Amino acid sequence: MAALPVSAMAQGTNDGLGGGDVDIKSLYELVTKHEQKSKALNIYINYGTSYQTTRDSREGEWTSRLYNRDLRLEMVGWLTDNIYYRFRHRLTKSNTAESEDNFAKATDYMMVGWKFNDHWSIQGGKKCQALGSFEFDENTLFVYQFSDIENCIESSKAAINLVYNATPDQQFSAEISNTYTGKLKDEFGENAKVTTGKVTSSSDDETTTVDTQLLEKANHPLSYTAGWNGKFFGGKLQTRWSYTLRTLAKHKYSRMVRLGQKLNLDHLHWYIDYNMTYDDLDRMRIASKETVSVMAPQETNLYAGKVRYQGLVTKLEVDLAPDWKFEAKGMYETASMTQSEQYKTTARRSATSAH
């Protein structure tokens, strides 16, 4: 696939107040040409579009299109020295309120925070979960292609996050959030089933037997995340690590480890992320799409269970000139059903890109 991107630069990373990008002026400053004195309201517009040409190797056909990758409105500010807020809304997603949190999927952020002092703060509302990895925290306007696993992470949830800045370079967080934005039946459909992970095949009649269970809603479908963002050697080495335990359904859980490391030099930036997720219920549905129709073609609403996803993602950025940079990105991902001999490695994907 080839793409010619056009972007309107704005801040907008997924962490905190989204101020990871530098030299970004607010809409007020761009329009009035005056320096903004107040911190109460900063308005940003994030917009990215591209012309894409794609070849489908299965059909041997080329297709082209103009594609609106992202369009969102963002407002950030400090109302007092202690109270801050962030609002981010995508104009390319549904505005219908979800059944669990009553927020629309279009709303990424509607967060209010209280800063107790230089060390402690608390945030609440809808926000991006405090997950590790550097790919997760990138402004989507500047991402040519996400990894499959990252592309399946729905991170904007109603949450409460406690943040502790031990030093200016070491931050720790503890967060409780909803696992879903909708009810279980809205996420997986009526009478959904999940495999227990046990799949047996008979060599005599060439049949496959799949052990399944009916999904039941959990009383407390919540996620618990512990995170660490660190900087060393004046910010030249950075980390974004997290561990998450999610309640997916009754007696169905997910464990997620995300470890991001980044080398951040003056003209060279390079990160390596490792992600591992072990799901009792295939929340990302990647393995389910590959295996369920083969394992149990008679089932109409079945999801894989005991699924493990692993991924390595790396990205290199080299600043060639003030307005020019070279980027190269690679990823390697696997999905497996750990308790099935037949599907211990069900999907494997690797990809590279440079631009």
Where are these regions (language model features)?
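Detector for outer-membrane/organellar transmembrane beta-barrel domains
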Residues: 22, 36-40, 83, 219-336
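N-terminal periplasmic/intermembrane-space "pro-region" immediately following the signal or transit peptide
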Residues: 2-48
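Outer membrane beta-barrel
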Residues: 32-54, 60-182, 230-231
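Predominantly the C-terminal beta-signal and adjacent terminal strand-loop region
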Residues: 326-355
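Outer-membrane beta-barrel translocator domains and adjoining extracellular loop/strand segments
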Residues: 54-61, 66, 95-106, 135-141, ...
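Aromatic- and glycine-enriched pocket-lining scaffold segments that form the walls
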Residues: 146-242
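Outer-membrane beta-barrel architecture
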Residues: 29-30, 72-74, 111-113, 161-163, ...
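Residues that define the transmembrane beta-barrel architecture of outer-membrane proteins
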Residues: 62-69, 103-108, 154-158, 218-224, ...
